[in-house]
Design a protein with these regions (language model features):
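N-terminal binding-site loop/beta-alpha segment at the start of enzyme catalytic domains
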Residues: 1-29, 82, 151, 232
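Aromatic/hydrophobic pocket-lining residues that form the small-molecule binding cavity
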Residues: 8, 45, 49, 76-79, ...
Length: 233
């Protein structure tokens, strides 16, 4: 949906066949995700998935998400049926949703799908905790992928974040990533800076105390840095 499947897939293929691939990684070692831009009909969704697989050139897509709950109940359920069939046909390995609120998830579960959603990708961080959605997901074994886990750098100098970063000898970004991990989420930190990408992943050397996790939880102010369709009809 971001019009970069071809380029992203080529980058993966080029790397796997290059001398930079010093660990001899194979296609199955790479986790490639794409999305359906909008829900409409079964046929439209099914064709879009096939097109995405062809565009990326990787043979299959590891995780395919319905980008939002927009489109209404019928479109949501028909689009999910297309995901199920694409999994059966081997075009994708795992299906999930994105920006789904509790009512959308419950709607999908109530429809008795053949395949349950494995992932719900939502904006989640200490300033927008969305515990209502996260708790529902975890109760139903749906992995929470946290996008914008760094709050798009809007809160790096917040007194609590700055103080705890100093306490744990880490960067604000590392602290925020660690918060997501300790809640059981899969954070998706974003950067175009190679050093910062590496830095954001170096979070295994410390753990945030429970009392400090609670301090960070209390920062919630429903800060939406992009959009929030989780309550759409």
């Amino acid at each position: 949906m971001y019009h970069n499947e071809k380029e992203s897939g080529k980058a993966v293929s080029d790397f796997l066949s290059s001398s930079d691939n010093t660990d001899s990684l194979k296609r199955e070692d790479i986790h490639f995700t794409s999305k359906l831009a909008s829900n409409s009909s079964y046929d439209a969704a099914r064709k879009s998935i096939t097109r995405s697989v062809k565009e990326c050139g990787l043979g299959y897509i590891d995780l395919f998400l319905l980008h939002s709950p927009h489109g209404g109940k019928k479109a949501r359920l028909e689009s999910w049926r297309a995901v199920e069939d694409a999994i059966d046909d081997g075009e994708i390995r795992i299906g999930g949703v994105s920006n789904y609120g509790v009512k959308h998830l419950q709607e999908l579960l109530d429809s008795k799908p053949r395949i349950l959603p494995a992932v719900n990708q939502i904006e989640i961080h200490p300033f927008n905790t969305r515990f209502d959605i996260a708790d529902f997901c975890q109760e139903h074994d749906i992995v929470v992928e946290a996008y914008a886990p760094l709050v798009r750098a809007l809160k790096m100098k917040h007194p609590v974040i700055a103080s705890l970063s100093k306490k744990y000898s880490c960067t604000p970004g590392q602290l925020l990533v660690r918060w997501s991990l300790q809640h059981g989420y899969v954070p998706l930190p974003k950067s175009v800076n190679k050093a910062r990408i590496v830095e954001n992943g170096e979070v295994g050397g410390f753990s945030i105390d429970d009392s400090d996790i609670k301090k960070m939880d209390a920062l919630d102010e429903y800060l939406v840095t992009d959009w929030d369709p989780t309550d759409t009809a």
